[in-house]
């Protein structure tokens, strides 16, 4: 029977390089019931997906058997505990070892090399006693080796477990130099005992004790720099943790009490004064204020809060006194979820890391074989044993599996942290990698490119009315309606401080509008057909309404007491940054497709406003995923939506991006969550992903290039041609800097700016043969709409134009008519072809003289 699958995190100790993490991963995969395991060298952690018969105890035992330590993480731990884990004291420990090593190394190097290389005076005690010099070097080198014994313990343990690591290479290199030098020292003793001072001095030059000590010290320098740099990669997470308030002021038993923030429970009432941070997620009960949410969303403009508004932990109350009810506390707050998401993204592996993983698994054994082969080759060629040994040691100490192992995770860690800082959350490392490969972005119109709620855009009063009187009538009539368009009108009236009158006998007229009595007068509001049926709508107002409809707006006509009051146009307004976002995506070589359930006319109007390239209109919610699937034939697709109504499409896409998530950051369908409602963050997420990918490629190139060039040089490849041999000490110095360079390069991502273009040229956009560009759609719509113009004599006033317009609109096949008194003509938009003679006869029948029709 298969048990319930569970995901658990473990802290892992003893790992020093990529070979270690690869060995731990293999060991855990061998436990029956383990489905998936990811080991992070950067955070010294492991995430395991397993079911029965696997248990946490068995997993820890497997890690222990592999020569390392593991323990389950405390999932419910406080943020302070998590921060303590991130703030490792490893750099401090390494620094202590480094200082002690340098203190011993300096006198060692003075005695062993100072007088030879720089002519420094030799202390009198060593002036004519080579054996004393040798014993002095042995003593100091032994002390350095004891101080850095962890290399030997870790290296030997991993070697005996069949998984040699970087420490194995370091310990073998320094131990070989130490053992060989000790053997030479015995030869010196023998020569000194026999009185052969010249031979003893000759053997002194064959000592490599300073190399053994220098190798360990330089590697420790590299480890220290690496540890400090690795600590900086978690700065983003630590800064998020620092945002959480330590205390909260709650109301219990009618009194205010200050308690630790983690002790607030759901349902508690808490108060927040101006200048204080909000301790937990909640809902405002009373009070009004502006809240700075930039810490969570990256949005610098404060958000107004009123009773009923949601507030989030770690946001700053600026100027009002708020009383709130706690809705999400502890690990459930938005801040905690963001921190967990960044940690999870850093703990997972990107597909690109598999290359380094494969190489790391065989890297150390291969290097050991190369070192042995190099030493043997030089011995066979007739070179002295000391020379051959130096080449083998150089190969061992210059090789660096750490650079390979850190190339990807450090970039992922810094990248995901920078994303969180700017309100862009990547759920996994795969999502962070995949987003940058996006070729086609599909954007849902409503709520993504537009505000998502209708707003009043135009107020066109008829004769005898002004804007305020028309808006008051409309608000009075719509006050009892639940329609979204009605809500837009009542909201506009409220913003204009207009008080609506009481509507009596309210009645909804499905498909047409509403009716009611206001101040004893009959009032109606709705579409053009409703007012036409009452004989109220005149041609001029109808033409104005059609013009508004042509702009993608919904015209609502209002009348009272049988008299037309005017038109109020309502539309879902395009977001202020949508046009700029589309422009940015296009400049990055990304195709944009707008997906909407709206009719073609409205969709094309919006597309024209923002410059989107392609439009798919009249799409039912359930069909959005099918559209995404078709687009995937042409390239990698990212779907952008609200994460709820678009869930199937988000799941179908290569990358699902949920926009404007706010407090709901744990949307299951999305791979990337954008905290703000800004479409520009879509471009920012792609831009950040591309920079992270570029950084990973640079790191991997450096790691492979360094080892591919360094190992042959260390083995002596330059000796036959240039007579250049690499001293083991220089090899150790190169190794110590390689990992530091990789981590430092990743830290450059901290300078990421969301609106800064990526370096390099963008790839040309993919072609979408299955879709017609929006510009062509608009052009074709304009071209295919048949138009005819008839020139008319005899029109004297607006009454005449209205008479002509009414006569022409009565013809079958005529969609709309625009009559110009000044130009003495009428322009007809036709649904079907209408004969010129029919048009001219209609004008004659109306009492006017048509001169030409074309």
Please annotate each region the language model reported:
Residues 456, 460-588, 600, 612-628:
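P-type ATPase nucleotide-binding
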Residues 22, 438, 518-520, 544, ...:
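Conserved ATP-binding TGD loop and adjacent catalytic N/P-domain core of P-type ATPases
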Residues 1-132, 255-256, 340-348, 753-854:
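Flexible metal-binding regulatory segments at protein termini and peripheral loops
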Residues 142-151, 158-161, 175, 211-240, ...:
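Hydrophobic alpha-helical transmembrane segments
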Residues 32-51, 56, 61, 206-209, ...:
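Conserved cytosolic catalytic loops of P-type ATPases
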Residues 92-247, 358, 459, 723-728, ...:
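Transmembrane helix-loop-helix hairpins at the membrane interface
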Residues 117-131, 160, 179, 418, ...:
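Membrane-embedded alpha-helical bundles of multi-pass transporters
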Residues 82, 188, 197-200, 213-274, ...:
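Juxtamembrane coupling segments of multi-pass membrane pumps/enzymes
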